């Protein structure tokens, strides 16, 4: 009888402990703070660290439930400026005009340490440097800062701005219209469109903007946050960025595994696995020279670009040094 009672007691205790464990786990889940994060474009390897951090539970460790939102039809920055979401992905160059108009946003982490963007063309067009764009069709997004940079590099080498022909570039990637002859050259980010061109076995030429003007080694892309949110939720913002940093550090250390996680969260990339892995291998080396300092801004480089913007009178109001970025939330 004693053995029976002991067994019954043990059974009841086990059930109670299981129930308590379930309640505790549910309580833990309920305690997670939901935070929205808006992407800038279709899911790509710029975003890998976010999905790694979510998959690996890094956000949950910080008490955060990050809800990654797809890119809007309009600018991601407008959603952040208007406090529709606290975080998003944007670019230092595109921030210039927003900041000059008093937009309440701050870049809080650099996804990639150096500017990997540049001009791609088919090798047959013989475009190896900015001056070679003369007489060619350049596919443009028609962004004022973009055009100012291209024209500046072109003219610096003696090019005639009147002989730079512009064509609209509205495709989701620049490689397909380039291959089809809609334009002769386009501005791309090498990790995605450059690697896409390689996967398509296209013979291309490519040059980095920063190689022709060091002031154009700006930060792109960056994580931006709403200023009011940062003031009211400083510790929460730090937790979000701590988890994101862990995600990108993992991607630096394990590019192939990180690519698998990205593909898992973006099934549309499944049939492009080899391309995605190659893109990730390239980008994992670009995220940061020193993984311990991922996300941190170099004030000199940030300011050098906005001084260039000021000198070229691209914005209505000049941008003061140290405008628009902070390392306070990533360190």
Positions of PLM-derived features:
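Short, low-complexity disordered leader/linker segments with a strong preference
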Residues: 1-34, 330-331
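Short, hydrophobic secondary-structure boundary micro-motifs
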Residues: 62, 107, 259-261, 317-319
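Short, surface-exposed acidic
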Residues: 161-165, 268-279, 315-323
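Conserved C-terminal helix/tail region of periplasmic/extracytoplasmic solute-binding proteins
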Residues: 302-331
């Amino acid at each position: 009888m004693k053995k029976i009672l002991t067994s019954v007691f043990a059974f009841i205790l086990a059930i109670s402990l299981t129930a308590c464990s379930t309640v505790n786990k549910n309580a833990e889940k309920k305690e997670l703070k939901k935070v929205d994060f808006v992407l800038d474009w279709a899911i790509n390897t710029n975003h890998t660290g976010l999905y790694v951090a979510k998959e690996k539970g890094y956000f949950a460790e910080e008490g955060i439930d990050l809800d990654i939102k797809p890119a809007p039809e309009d600018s991601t920055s407008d959603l952040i400026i208007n406090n529709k979401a606290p975080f998003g992905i944007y670019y230092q160059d595109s921030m210039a005009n927003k900041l000059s108009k008093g937009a309440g946003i701050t870049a809080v982490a650099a996804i990639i340490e150096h500017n990997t963007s540049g001009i791609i063309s088919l090798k047959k067009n013989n475009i190896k440097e900015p001056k070679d764009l003369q007489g060619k069709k350049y596919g443009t997004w028609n962004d004022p800062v973009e055009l100012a940079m291209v024209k500046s590099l072109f003219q610096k080498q003696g090019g005639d701005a009147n002989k730079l022909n512009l064509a609209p570039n509205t495709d989701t990637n620049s490689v397909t219209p380039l291959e089809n002859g809609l334009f002769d050259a386009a501005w791309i980010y090498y990790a995605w469109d450059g690697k896409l061109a390689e996967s398509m076995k296209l013979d291309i030429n490519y040059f980095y903007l920063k190689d022709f003007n060091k002031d154009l080694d700006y930060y792109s892309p960056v994580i931006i946050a709403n200023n009011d949110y940062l003031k009211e939720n400083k510790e929460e913002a730090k937790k979000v960025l701590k988890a994101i940093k862990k995600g990108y550090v993992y991607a630096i250390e394990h590019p192939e595994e990180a690519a698998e996680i990205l593909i898992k969260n973006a099934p549309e990339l499944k049939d492009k696995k080899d391309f995605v892995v190659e893109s990730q291998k390239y980008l994992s080396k670009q995220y940061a020279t020193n993984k311990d300092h991922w996300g941190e801004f170099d004030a000199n480089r940030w300011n050098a670009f906005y001084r260039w913007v000021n000198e070229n009178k691209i914005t209505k109001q000049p941008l003061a040094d140290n405008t628009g970025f902070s390392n306070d939330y990533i360190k």
